[in-house]
Design a protein with these regions (language model features):
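Acidic, carboxylate-rich catalytic segments that either coordinate divalent cations
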Residues: 268
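Metal-dependent nuclease catalytic cores that hydrolyze phosphodiester bonds in DNA/RNA
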Residues: 1-169
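Mg2+/Mn2+-dependent nuclease catalytic core
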Residues: 156-265
Length: 268
């Protein structure tokens, strides 16, 4: 039995959870467990300690978090420099307080972009789930149009969560179990600031995520693509479809990261 053919589990009715996925935990059969009720009776984010206790498994994106992301690091450095250029030291402010304020200001830029991206992503997700949503309709229609131009009319399944025997889980934005060539399609939606599609490129992180999703969903030969939705120009999108050779390489890389994550965290 190959790694890609090992048993997997689906959440029969994927919960419509819009909570933060910052902790990215799932039950073995694919039910999201982003939060947990603590001993004090209050809801809080699920931790690694909780995961060990309840036998939860990490999401694909949590596993990918152990890998260095040079593009993200460069972007964060730029945000800090921009915040420093637009902020002056206040009278009586200590060096450390000034540095802390610059760092917080730089993080706010990222939070603002992330918040807008989440809103757009939610609007697109709602469309494919058949849920009425009034915001960001130009972004939604641009995404729908781009997917139809690329793949034709496909019976998309939105936000399906899964758990896999190898010890990883996740929730896929869009997938179809069959298409014109019969192997299925897996699509991950990304929002990004861009006005020229030529500026948009895919990274190994995207490749690994999609390759793990298709295995987790039980369609290991599916086509895989990222659709990048512009935050700055409503309706503008770019689709990057990965080759089968890249996807095979991506899954090998992901399995290496998964093994590292499990050993590092002493949790399988």
């Amino acid at each position: 039995m190959t790694e890609q053919s090992k048993s997997l589990f689906y959440a029969s009715e994927p919960p419509k959870i819009r909570a933060s996925e910052s902790n990215h935990w799932y039950t073995r059969d694919g039910i999201p467990q982003y939060t947990i009720v603590g001993k004090n009776g209050k809801e809080r984010n699920t931790t690694l300690r909780d995961a060990r206790e309840h036998n939860y498994i990490p999401s694909v994106t949590t596993v990918l978090g152990v890998a260095n992301k040079p593009a993200l690091v460069a972007w964060m450095q730029t945000q800090v420099l921009m915040a420093a250029l637009t902020s002056t030291k206040r009278e009586g402010e200590s060096e450390q307080d000034y540095i802390d304020r610059i760092i917080q200001d730089s993080k706010q830029q990222g939070r603002d972009a992330a918040d807008l991206g989440t809103e757009i992503h939610t609007a697109i997700e709602s469309f494919f789930e058949g849920i009425s949503h009034d915001k960001h309709q130009e972004h939604v229609q641009g995404c729908v149009r781009s997917l139809e131009e690329q793949y034709g009319r496909v019976g998309w399944i939105a936000e399906r969560s899964f758990g896999h025997e190898l010890g990883f889980a996740g929730k896929c934005d869009l997938h179809a179990t069959n298409d014109a060539i019969g192997n299925g399609i897996v699509v991950d939606i990304k929002t990004k600031d861009f006005t020229d599609p030529k500026d948009v490129v895919g990274y190994d992180e995207h490749l690994m995520q999609l390759s793990a999703y298709r295995v987790g969903l039980g369609i290991p030969n599916a086509r895989c693509a990222n659709i990048f939705v512009s935050r700055t120009q409503a309706g503008l999108c770019k689709i990057i479809e990965w080759s089968e050779e890249d996807l095979q390489r991506g899954f090998e890389m992901f399995c290496s990261l998964l093994k590292f994550w499990q050993l590092k965290n002493k949790h399988k």
